[in-house]
């Protein structure tokens, strides 16, 4: 995963260290958004009358995005409510002319910011809404929360490297005790499932 040690780092200094391509993308996107109408970023951190609407905006954008459907959609809503109760939520919503076009869920705890969920409306892709909102939330956690580290959590997506500075590899290990019935059954389910997925993928191509 990708992370950013950032103790004492201001957003201005942080952004100056980003690749020039990313800086240009954000600058151009801001100009495009300004020309298109009224762009606004709201960052929700506490419970209140606007939180439910912000969560609904995230859910709506997520459904319109390229992301696969949530297996447990109610989990995200409950997590946001709980995190807001504890002051750990940073739910950002970027809107254009009153219509939400991007949303991200960050969580802040014990000096670390975790980028948990993000999505944007594909119809608004020309505005680079994901980059604009990431920049806004990064500014918030660096200058307001003064976190010591930002963590992009799992995934090695290329775009994460533009925002982070350190790459941390994680390797998983799974083992089965084949001398026991339970171990044999678990192994059969695991490897049988892998073969079934591979077979289905072959059929789809």
Regions found by a protein language model. Name each.
Residues 1, 27-30, 66-70, 118, ...:
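Glycine-rich loops and low-complexity Gly/Arg-rich segments
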Residues 1-11, 17, 145-205:
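Active-site/acyl-donor-binding loops of N-acyltransferases
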Residues 1-126:
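A conserved beta-strand-loop-helix scaffold within acyl/acetyltransferase catalytic domains
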Residues 23, 43, 50, 79-82, ...:
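Short, surface-exposed, charged/polar-biased interaction segments
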Residues 37-40, 75-83, 127-132, 141-144, ...:
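Low-complexity, flexible helical/coil segments
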Residues 110-168, 175:
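Acyl-donor binding region in acyl/amide transferases
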